[in-house]
Every structure is written in C-alpha cells, then in structure tokens.
C-alpha cells in the first residue's frame, strides 16, 4: 500500500475507488495499491 498525495492509475487493471471519503486504487497487482493521504 502506497500512501500518496495524488493517486494515479498505473496500469489498465487499476481502478480508482472512493471509500468513505478516501480515494483508493485497487488492482490485481498488489504493488499498485494506493491510498490518498
């Protein structure tokens, strides 16, 4: 899980999701998981 000020989709499998006010990236590749913070 990477915590970043700006989250971006890295590959075509990355999906940007907003969960309870937090922007997250979910992906098949665990290295691409991100959270805004």
Swiss-Prot record:
SUPFAM superfamilies: Ribosomal protein L36. Signal peptide: none annotated. InterPro entries: Ribosomal_bL36, Ribosomal_bL36_sp. Keywords: Ribonucleoprotein, Ribosomal protein. Coiled coil: none annotated. The keyword Ribosomal protein applies. One of its GO terms (molecular function) is structural constituent of ribosome. The keyword Ribosomal protein applies. One of its GO terms (cellular component) is cytoplasm. Pfam families: Ribosomal_L36. One of its GO terms (biological process) is translation. Belongs to the bacterial ribosomal protein bL36 family. This is Large ribosomal subunit protein bL36.
């Amino acid at each position: 899980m990477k915590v970043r000020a700006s989250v971006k989709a890295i590959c075509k499998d990355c999906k940007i999701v907003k969960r309870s006010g937090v922007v997250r990236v979910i992906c098949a590749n665990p290295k691409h998981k991100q959270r805004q913070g």
